[in-house]
Amino acid sequence: MNAEQREYIGIINQSAEEVILIKKTGWEEVNLPGHAHGKCQIIYTLAGTLHVEIGSESYFVPEKHIAWIPGGAEHKLSSNSQQVSMAIFYVNLEPLGENDPKGEFAIYTANALIGENLKFIASKGKVIEKEKQPDLYNFTLGFFNLLPQMSPGKELLLKSLVIPND
């Protein structure tokens, strides 16, 4: 992990509970080793394919899909030397019980409504603070809380397969 990545993870971990952080990438290669942070990480792949590793499992997040990584989950991100463009959101979302999908890793399809809302939220800067932008903060928090129900269906998790040579 390079110094810039360590610094940003520190910013995430030190940010207040009522702050939503937003990071947009251009076309870039992703190679982030295993890490965890207290906020839920919601990654919208605008273009390209992202690989997410959680524990011993590896998943593909194709273009126009969302990776939902719960807070505290150890994960690795990579693009296997390919370039990817993403909008990444870090937000405090506490699961409401064992069966709440907010507490589990998931991949969701982004239909037009979801995609446009994510782009709108991402266009509002790098930080949304409840104290300074209460309406935008409440909209964003409500949107992310409803996202698992709004998605056309939780995708089958696209796992990497090991194919034998024989």
PLM segments and residue spans:
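Generic detection of short hydrophobic beta-strand segments and adjacent strand-loop junctions
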Residues: 59-61, 106-109
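Short acidic-glycine-tyrosine-enriched beta hairpin
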Residues: 56-71
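Generic protein-terminus/edge-of-domain signal
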Residues: 1-53, 59
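Short beta->alpha connector loops
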Residues: 50, 72-73
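An amphipathic alpha-helical interaction segment
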Residues: 89, 109-166
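Ligand-binding loop in jelly-roll beta-barrel domains
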Residues: 73-105
